[in-house]
Structures are given as C-alpha cells and as structure tokens.
C-alpha cells in the first residue's frame, strides 16, 4: 500500500531530530495523526514561533527572544567578574540547575575541529576576544566538554586569557571523558564546578 505523500514528508522531517530513526519517526507521525491531532497542531505552532522568534543574545550568544538574555541583563551577574565559556546553549541550562555559578556566559556554538573546517572564527573566538578586551573579568572558567576537541578548545582559550593576565580555570573532570554537559546529573556537575583548577 502506498502511503500519503504528506505522511511520508512528516516522517522524513521528524528524522531530523537527534536519535530519531525511521521507525521512531514513523511511530511519532502515526501517534500524532491517530491520537493527538491537537497536540500536533500545538507542536507545529510552537516550532513555528520558536524558529521565527528565537535568536542569539548579542553578548553571550545563547538563545533568546530579546537583544540580550536575562542572565546578561542581570546587574548582579554583570559585576561578578566571572565568565564561563561553554560549547552549547544547553550547557548553560545544565550549569544553572546546579546553582553553583553566579557569573555570565559565552557560548561557542561548538568546538575547534580543524579537520571539519571549524577554526577560531567559526566558534566566535574573535567575539570572545572582544569581550575579554572590553569588559572586566577576573576569572574565565572553561566548561568545554571533556573530549579531544573540547580540550583543544579550552587550551586555545586559556592562551588567550593568559595573554591578558586573566585567571583561567577549567571545571574538574568529574564528568566522564567523552560525555556532554547537558546529559550530566546535577551532583556530578556541582562537584566539577567546585573542583575546577587553574590553567597556567
């Protein structure tokens, strides 16, 4: 039996989500059509709103609907002198849930990966350099993932900070090597923050 082109299109587009293969996408599509059409319409509206209205914070580059995000706008955080560098916006959420950090952030949107053509400019290190030059930070905390690429990125940023005589530390590796911040439990992340060490 030939299925509907619209259904095939829905299944194909659901596959763009991480971890969703052909079978999972098909189950999702059939569930929405058979049991939850109003939920499907709400999902479509939420996706449309998010895709059209959410951009990047002009200071830290996380996701926001405003020019600057709530964290960057917070006066107490502006005077903390602490900057935490993370790879992805989801990493901010993971760190915020621990309640261990009261400074500001900078999101790289990735990590250095020369083999994939991702150099310093592609992850916004020129913008980070400007922030370090224009704002007063007494410590930069590197919270990149404990991977080869994350380590290389952290070392590159550490050099940038040391050239400006800014204290630089890296969160401790209570996080499993090869893991990603957004999947780590709060206790492990708390220990990692409390056990961070200075580089250089």
Swiss-Prot record:
**Which portions of this protein are annotated as coiled-coil regions?**
none
Q: Which residue ranges does UniProt annotate as crossing the membrane?
A: none
Q: One Pfam family of this protein, by short name?
A: Toprim_4
Q: Which Gene3D superfamilies match?
A: 3.40.1360.10, 6.10.250.240, RecR Domain 1
Zinc finger (C4-type) positions are 57-72
Q: Which residues form the Toprim domain?
A: 81-176
Q: Which family is this protein grouped under?
A: Belongs to the RecR family.
Its biological purpose is as follows: May play a role in DNA repair. It seems to be involved in an RecBC-independent recombinational process of DNA repair. It may act with RecF and RecO.
Could you identify this protein by its name? Recombination protein RecR
Q: Which organism is it from?
A: Actinobacillus succinogenes (strain ATCC 55618 / DSM 22257 / CCUG 43843 / 130Z)
